[in-house]
Amino acid sequence: MFSLQDLCRKHLFILPDVFGEHVLQQLGLYWEKHGSLQRIGNDHILIRRDLILSINEALKIAAEEGNNEVVKLLLLWKGNLHYAIIGALEGDQYDLIYTYENQIEDYHHILPLIQDAKTFEKCHALERFCDVPCLLEHAIKHNMLPILQKYQEELFIRVYLRETLFELACLWQRYDILKWIEQTMHVYDLKIIFNIAISKRDLSMYSLGYVLLFDRGNTEATLLTQHLEKTAAKGLLHFVLETLKYGGNINIVLSQAVKYNHRKLLDYFLRQLPRKNIEKLLLLAVQEKASKKTLNLLLSYLNYSVKRIKKLLRYVIEYESTLVIRILLKKRINLIDAVLEKTVRYFSETKVKTIMDELSINPEKVIKMAIQKMRTDIVIQTSYIWEDDLERLIRLKNMVYTIKYEHGKKMLMKVIHGIYKNLLHDEKEKVMFHLAKFYIAQNAATQFRDICKDCCKLDVARFKPRFKQLILDCLDIITKKTCLNIMEILENHIISLFAMKMMTEDEKNLGLELLYKVISYKMISY
């Protein structure tokens, strides 16, 4: 509970002129050797009606003098007790400190307010369970180099403590302390200063690290390489430039910039590079599957004109990185056919499928290229894009008519027949009669013989009429160019039909006429 006097003192802002020194002393508004005290606003006081001080500044002075009455008044006026403790320490007024110690949770909280090293150490000593390492840690935190200098002997002996404090100085970015520790005692490993500088993006500390490193006479190339890799990977241009002052290979920087898509870094160095080096970086960008913006940047420095096309295509296929092709395509530079040709010629069907999907290439186009390169495996695998077997047969059959060279047609016919042979019995029956006519038209004797055998295995009641009609239809298809083997197959089946006595008189006459036609063609063939 506040007394009436305390309430008056707390809220009295204007002192009447009639108040003399005696009245002010009775009210507790008089500071011995200083004069009357008057509150101004929330943060300041007026002494003797002519000197203005902050409440906390006045608290320090009053506590240093050991004037607890004034301290209590200033605390009523919302002063900070921490400043009273600081003042008491400066004046060695420990009785005053003990008066308020129950109100202090942790003396470490007062340390940031202290500028003087001796007072800092005295304040830390009030925390009963703290030792020298704790003091030194807080000295670094609050940049109190004189305290560290005082305990230099101990730091010489305690190597682990010295290394720990050096790391803390890095974390809290205390450059003077870092310099002092390294120059007076040395630390085991300076890598920590670089690692923390990079993580905090602190270029000043990074530069200091090199000053300390080269003061030792250390010019280790591997360390420069590591720093270039790390800083370039993070896209830290100014750190890269700082490192390059001391040496290192710029190619490391460029490789990392491409790998991690740091265009600002790339743009800075690309203008200094010859064309052949930029082309190498483009290949690396394809290998690393760089972003569209990175590829565009590299291509723009090449004016979207790539001279090493073959090598570029090899990288596109090998690393399944087709974005560069799509970018060039937008610039009306079409490399899709070249990519497809190279992929089909040299790579597996899996790689072909990946390229086909990424570049949205029509499967018919892939199959035609595969036929041209005699890649049966790719033809078969690509045809699986049509899941329905009957659809696959129809599409491949239609493609036969578009192929001009004979060896390609023969290869595709074998693929078609392979698909047919793997069909289920019911599915075979749906296509066999159509395929038979197709095989005759394409002079595929082996396939025609197989399909005729399959026809003969059908149910007799259903087989005879359809097979008879098939043979009659086939006789209409044959020409002078029809191969001898097909003619012999037809001849045998016509004779079989006569033997089975399943032909009408008109059909017999037609059969004899057609048989004569077959024999005539055979004679011509001989």
Swiss-Prot record:
The protein's UniProt keywords, in alphabetical order, are: Late protein
Origin organism is: African swine fever virus (isolate Pig/Kenya/KEN-50/1950)
Signal peptide location in the record? none
Function, in words: Plays a role in virus cell tropism, and may be required for efficient virus replication in macrophages.
Name of this chain's protein: Protein MGF 505-2R
Determine if Cytoplasm is one of this entry's keywords.
Answer: no
Describe how expression is induced or repressed.
Expressed in the late phase of the viral replicative cycle.
TM region positions: none
* Family as reported in the entry's similarity comment: Belongs to the asfivirus MGF 505 family.
Extract the InterPro entries matched here: MGF_505 (IPR004858)
